Amino acid sequence: LVPLFVFILFLHKCFFTTSNNNKKLPPSPRKLPIIGNLHQLGLHPHRSLHKLSKKYGPVMLLHLGSKPVIVASSVEAVRDIMKTNDLVWSNRPKSKMADRLIYGSKDVSFSPHGEYWRQIRSITVLHLLSNKRVQSYRAAREEETSNMIEKLKQMSNSSSSATDLRDLFCWLAYNIINRVALGKKYNDEIDAKATLDKFVELLGTFNVGDYIPCLEWVNKITGFDSKVDKVAKDLDTFLEFVIEAHMIRNEKEENRAGESKDLVDVLLEIQNGKETGFPIQRDSLKALLLDPFSAGTDTIYTVLEWTMTELLRHPRAMEKLQNEVQGLAQEKAEITEDDLPNMHYLKAVIKETLRLHPPIPLLLP
């Protein structure tokens, strides 16, 4: 009887302890014990949420495991949350996965709202993503794009079979971000790409402990925790290798005239107090270096892949875009970023692709 009584208390604590207040809550679909409404999200949560909003309205309450979640599906509701009451909703739930992989969630995306977040956001906007800084990486973007096109030509000439563009786009995104963030392409050092790919994959993996805390032990049994620990360790080893290489190079004061600074250089200057009055710690520096990889790799190649897919599905659109490119390239060896302001149809194609296939259809909670 004692084990049964303890088990009943355990269930009550985990699943049935609720607030007894009489606050009016948004409409909500019926939830199941333990998992709440998780089963209703399916493989495409944004589509499932859209269907649920048709039934329960533009503002509804879901329970993802033990976590209550408000879902806003109309312009008015989103404006009220993100603009009118921005400070009320400015924080986000703690993510155990981000804590373990991103040094206690010290990056811009996952750090809690507060003075630290305001400082690193300011650093990111003013020093890492300013127009001047983005333009300084133009040569890297154009060179890697040319390399990809040349490789595509070689693959087309040497084989009669179909070419997998996804792999090419993936390497394009990875190489550009490597050069922008870390200063060069790291393809062989301690298997950098495999480690970074695992990092991005794990960051988007469902972690049962975040939603059903009393089932967190499942991760230990399945070996998931060990996998996360190994990736975190490999990631830290790689970032330490990159940072130490930059510090040694800077100490030697090697001639870098005309060479643009990468993100590691900028963050090291900030850490030394040369750029701002907010010196950042080593873990914060490494966390900020991971943001371009977590936010910029799969989003880039996914959009490129879907753009090509839609153009192949719509030959007339493909022909119209080809005519635009050929018109600009008549007297030029190649198209550059200077031509983008005149490529109106290309911009329309990209916007339509983003509308049909948004790489991140849901905002971070």
UniProtKB/Swiss-Prot annotation:
GO terms for molecular function: heme binding; iron ion binding; monooxygenase activity; oxidoreductase activity, acting on paired donors, with incorporation or reduction of molecular oxygen. Its EC number is 1.14.-.-. Transmembrane segments: none annotated. Keywords: Heme, Iron, Metal-binding, Monooxygenase, Oxidoreductase. It holds the Pfam family p450. SUPFAM superfamilies: Cytochrome P450. Its cofactor is heme. InterPro entries: Cyt_P450, Cyt_P450_E_grp-I, Cyt_P450_sf. Gene3D superfamilies: Cytochrome P450. May have a role in maturation, such as during flavor formation or other metabolite production specific to aging tissues. Belongs to the cytochrome P450 family. This is Cytochrome P450 71A3. It comes from Solanum melongena.
